[in-house]
Amino acid sequence: MQRVNMIMAESPGLITICLLGYLLSAECTVFLDHENANKILNRPKRYNSGKLEEFVQGNLERECMEEKCSFEEAREVFENTERTTEFWKQYVDGDQCESNPCLNGGSCKDDINSYECWCPFGFEGKNCELDVTCNIKNGRCEQFCKNSADNKVVCSCTEGYRLAENQKSCEPAVPFPCGRVSVSQTSKLTRAETVFPDVDYVNSTEAETILDNITQSTQSFNDFTRVVGGEDAKPGQFPWQVVLNGKVDAFCGGSIVNEKWIVTAAHCVETGVKITVVAGEHNIEETEHTEQKRNVIRIIPHHNYNAAINKYNHDIALLELDEPLVLNSYVTPICIADKEYTNIFLKFGSGYVSGWGRVFHKGRSALVLQYLRVPLVDRATCLRSTKFTIYNNMFCAGFHEGGRDSCQGDSGGPHVTEVEGTSFLTGIISWGEECAMKGKYGIYTKVSRYVNWIKEKTKLT
């Protein structure tokens, strides 16, 4: 034993070699072989497995989906700052455009905790909710729209109204504003409101030439003092309507412009014939205590009207009353817009006519005020429907199939267009061939041609 100890002390290297040989010859039971080890760690190889990531292109799944990435790591994937920024906006807080917040056709661009709407022409605001041009839906104005110097929408209202708090709607500024039905039992019968379409306001006024200088022999019209197929109006439903009495009662109609003036057809009036105007009328054979009678003290036909040349060209006249009318729910003026808007309103496509005229061709006159909704007829169809001249200051309205029309005794009465609950004068009943005849239409004086003249002559002093 002493000898062994001496050998170990003198030859430590020998001992180490012996131990190493023993270990190498022993069977290893701690580690699995290569094949079995792979069965336990069965993990798919990654895209760049075996390579240094710093030297390969980034992978979106590896960089940002398996674990949260930084902007720089995302930049490695896209290799483009702009594309990385677009991805980053949604990656950080989701897609803010998912709810489609942009209105009126706006395009949404996502941002971090926010979004941006790219608005089409005519709109602005956070969600493109603000109209900035009158060309689109009248700028959301209830009545009139004008573009300011910086191309912003400025709404306005006709006389007797003021802008509401929203700067879009119009509200009454006087007790009985024009064009409004205020009798409670008839307010439910107000005709369907007309909503502004998209309009090209630059070209809204037709490029028409008034044929002022045409000389033409007097034409022989049949029954051209021209509501057939209409309905009984309720008291106060058309408070701007008046009836004219002269040699015979209810020979023509008219509309209240203001307390002192009536507008009617020029062919209705004769110099030297006494005319009485009755406002607030409903049943011409009954006294309903809503009527107001006034005498006409002055007749002003349009300066281009000449019955000797043509009885229905420039067929418009103004009547001055001896005493002002007292405005109330049964006696209310009709609204008159400017030339541009009167023309736009007419193009809405349908209007209402009213009167006490004959209820059928050569038949009896109506006792109760009649009204009828009539569609506008395109000019080409209008011209083809008659052998008589249709001037540019006239328009056609009615039904091709016949059966409904204005008729004798309705002449001078109103053709009105309702705009968001307020009625505007767009025409004056003038003439036609018979009444409600198939293929024939009622012919009306186009008020847009005469609004400046009306307003100039009827100013209240």
UniProtKB/Swiss-Prot annotation:
GO terms for biological process: blood coagulation; proteolysis; zymogen activation. Residues 47-92 form the Gla domain. The active site is at residues 267, 315, 411. Changing residue 178 to W: In HEMB; severe. Ca(2+) 7 binds at residues 93-94, 96, 110-111. Ca(2+) 6 binds at residues 82, 86. Residues 227-459 form the Peptidase S1 domain. Ca(2+) 2 binds at residues 48, 53-54, 63, 73. The modification 4-carboxyglutamate is found at residues 53-54, 61, 63, 66-67, 72-73, 76, 79, 82, 86. Ca(2+) 1 binds at residues 47, 53, 63, 67. Changing residue 342 to M: In HEMB; moderate. Changing residue 119 to F: In HEMB; severe. GO terms for cellular component: collagen-containing extracellular matrix; endoplasmic reticulum lumen; extracellular exosome; extracellular region; extracellular space; Golgi lumen; plasma membrane. It is an enzyme of class 3 (hydrolase). Ca(2+) 5 binds at residues 72, 76. Changing residue 252 to S: In HEMB; severe. Mg(2+) 2 binds at residues 72, 76. Changing residue 138 to H: In HEMB; uncertain significance; decreased protein abundance; decreased function in blood coagulation. The keyword Phosphoprotein applies. Changing residue 384 to L: In THPH8; factor IX Padua; higher specific activity than wild-type. Glycans are attached at residues 85, 99, 107, 203, 205, 213, 215, 225. Residues 93-129, 130-171 form the EGF-like domain. Activated by factor XIa, which excises the activation peptide. The propeptide can also be removed by snake venom protease. Activated by coagulation factor VIIa-tissue factor (F7-F3) complex in calcium-dependent manner. Calcium binds to the gamma-carboxyglutamic acid (Gla) residues in the Gla domain. Calcium can also bind, with stronger affinity, to another site beyond the Gla domain. Under physiological ion concentrations, Ca(2+) is displaced by Mg(2+) from some of the gammaglutamate residues in the N-terminal Gla domain. This leads to a subtle conformation change that may affect the interaction with its binding protein. This is Coagulation factor IX.
